Amino acid sequence: MGKVGKRQKKMALRRIVQYTIFLIVFIVLSMFLLLNLIKSEPIVEDNPSSIATNSEDIKSEPTDTSPEFVHNQTRLRKDKCYTFLIVASDQSSGNADTIMVLTFDTVAGKVGIVSIPRDTLINPEDGYSTYPKINSTYLKGIDNLSGAVTNLLGIPIDFFITINTKGFVALIDSIGGIDFDIPVHMSYDDPVQNLYIHFEPGITHLNGEDTLKVCRLRDNNDGTLAYPDYDIGRTRTQQKILITVAKKLLQNPQKINEYIDIFTQYVHTNLSFRNTIWFINPALSLNLEQDISTATLPGDGTVSYKKARYCYELDPEETVKIVNDLISPYITALSIDDMNLFAVE
């Protein structure tokens, strides 16, 4: 083989490795709720299929009878704009501990990520759960949670990615941990779960278990809230951790085999391989500092509904604004009437 042939073969191999790294980083990243998930793809001339495809390869755009169109057949979607539901489960109860909606507008080159507080109030009469908190809908499976999110916010969910927290720990450990600026005093002990969280504000080196502890903390031993704004502060910390992890993943491409093993063992998604590959080109053009916007749905976390305490009642006006600004795939703006924001009267 001549020098030119060897050089071309080497370049092709390098490109395959690069794309594979971006793919793993993307899904691994979504491993706790975030952006790199965008690195999956289908085929350039084909659009990704919807959540109802059960990971089958689709060679054409979803039809107008697919779930994402059934919800609102009269509203037009932006071209090549897709929504993803990212979920991490609660280790003790099986409920969803982290719920995020990520929307990737591949034409505009923008990503919006919105966290839905786990205690967000929902109407039990809607049929997704008898308990009035959205995290409980995950007990019936990812499709049920997806339906609850669509019912709540009025937007379709095209794809899902669920993460096992053991995978998150393994991922952090595979890159040697992270250096993170702990935002608040953390002191919590739960012998039943063998959970002990003790950190002080400032730059701290965290291994996988430590990082998970920081992500999980809500209250301190003395009964005070870890964050003055409760779950808003907690999800803000989670988002910052994910960005930190994403950057370090990209700095360690030589660990690709470990990333693949972790993804295979701990991540579940309905993204087909072809869908995943389609997203690579638009994802490669993203600027992680400028093209990604994050927010947490605002509300009141002190609401009680029947026997459920500390429900998180969403602020209607602010919720509609955030959804329209960051994650709606529709051309025209949604209104409060398009959503199902339950409130205690």
Feature locations, PLM:
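Non-catalytic, solvent-exposed segments at the cell envelope interface
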Residues: 2-345
